[in-house]
């Protein structure tokens, strides 16, 4: 069962995506801010990270940079999930180290296709 770390602070988004991914056979860990996301990435070594960008305490850009510059976690794929569909927003997430980018609301089939490329 692939282990997914979902870094998201919106309870509705957490509930919906965690439920849908669990039904598809994934183990889903939740971090409600970027700081906890970095800590869980180090402690749990998930197979993939889904990262929101607008997070409290530490935003998703900084969390992505920290995860991707640490030798213990740099190989973990990160897919950013953001409500912002502007190209420059996507490019800034990729520049921070994200491996892919998808928009909210989440299209589950599209997201699963992206996830399966890394798993």
Region locations from a protein language model:
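The feature encodes the CheY-like receiver
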Residues: 14, 56, 74, 86, ...
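Conserved acidic carboxylate
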Residues: 8, 32
